């Protein structure tokens, strides 16, 4: 998100060696973001099991937003930073800035939707999740991730609402004394800084924190319930009751998936929090934050656009397998073994006269799908499969 004079480079400029090092680093960041996000999109498009998981629709849309950042925003910022000049005109400066705000806001909205999807999947019963996350609702959420950011990007920026009261300061900072040229400067007044930051960062961040906290609490409670039922089931039936490894493994898988998404969200916040905190503070201290600091915070946020695909590769088994298949040219060694024809039993546990069905599950696309459908007669939400 190109804010204030975040793109303004040092008044002294860079030496030849510094320019080479800087250009190499920025090029690596851009290339990593392009290839990584393309890999995520191709993986989901080619892998049928990944396409079955509703969360991955948000992940693909997020990858597309990050891909657009790396193609439409970052290269022009890198060129200006290295050359110490903006050569594309004032109108394209406004367009690029609007795209920057739009795509950055869309990214965090996607992460917020992912956290809500995981909340309904893990904290609610399967029927509630199916009723909440219908194809129509998913489509509306995805549409909102792209449409709502337009009201804090293209609309106010093109109308000049962000620079009301600070036009003279903007004109002063646009001028490049070293080359008698201009920079692409984007400064914001106090109302826009507060509104944009609250809508684009602070409200979604609060929702994500609440959602993931509930997921953490629910996952711990589910694990405790499974252990209690397994221990109580053995003496009630008069014979040793083997541990329901499938149910336990399923819960571990869901918990690990939630932790993975928490790490992704945490990296996003670490990358963008310095920028958004400074974005609110700077207008109230007469815009005294150095341009170099803005540039550092801005590119720290850009790095996040290339970071998510690598988090998927290292932390998510299904994505890791899909990436290996693509990179290794469809090597058969990395394909999933077929689960067709497998017989997966259901184990039961009796407590105080009530029968609790612990559904055995098989792994499918990194998620766990039920292979039997008897109804449990107790509040054993932990034993219910999560349809994602």
UniProtKB/Swiss-Prot annotation:
Keyword Zinc found: no
Assigned GO CC terms: endosome membrane; glutamatergic synapse; plasma membrane; postsynapse
Species of the source: Cavia porcellus (Guinea pig)
Membrane topology according to the record: Multi-pass membrane protein
Glycosylation: residue positions: 7
TM region(s), chain numbering: 20-44, 55-78, 93-117, 134-157, 189-212, 258-283, 291-314
Protein name as annotated: 5-hydroxytryptamine receptor 4
Role according to the record: G-protein coupled receptor for 5-hydroxytryptamine (serotonin), a biogenic hormone that functions as a neurotransmitter, a hormone and a mitogen. Ligand binding causes a conformation change that triggers signaling via guanine nucleotide-binding proteins (G proteins) and modulates the activity of downstream effectors. HTR4 is coupled to G(s) G alpha proteins and mediates activation of adenylate cyclase activity.
Keywords associated with the record: Cell membrane, Disulfide bond, Endosome, G-protein coupled receptor, Glycoprotein, Membrane, Receptor, Transducer, Transmembrane, Transmembrane helix
Extracellular compartment spans: 1-19, 79-92, 158-188, 284-290
Disulfide bonds: 93-184
UniProt record similarity statement: Belongs to the G-protein coupled receptor 1 family.
Matches recorded under InterPro entries: 5HT4_rcpt, GPCR_Rhodpsn, GPCR_Rhodpsn_7TM
Localization per Swiss-Prot or TrEMBL: Cell membrane; Endosome membrane
CDD domains assigned: 7tmA_5-HT4
SMART domains the UniProt entry points to: 7TM_GPCR_Srsx (SM01381)
Assembly and binders: Interacts (via C-terminus 330-346 AA) with GRK5; this interaction is promoted by 5-HT (serotonin).
Description of its domains: Specificity for G(s) G alpha proteins is determined by the length of transmembrane regions 5 and 6 (TM5 and TM6).
Ranges in the topological domain labelled Cytoplasmic: 45-54, 118-133, 213-257, 315-388
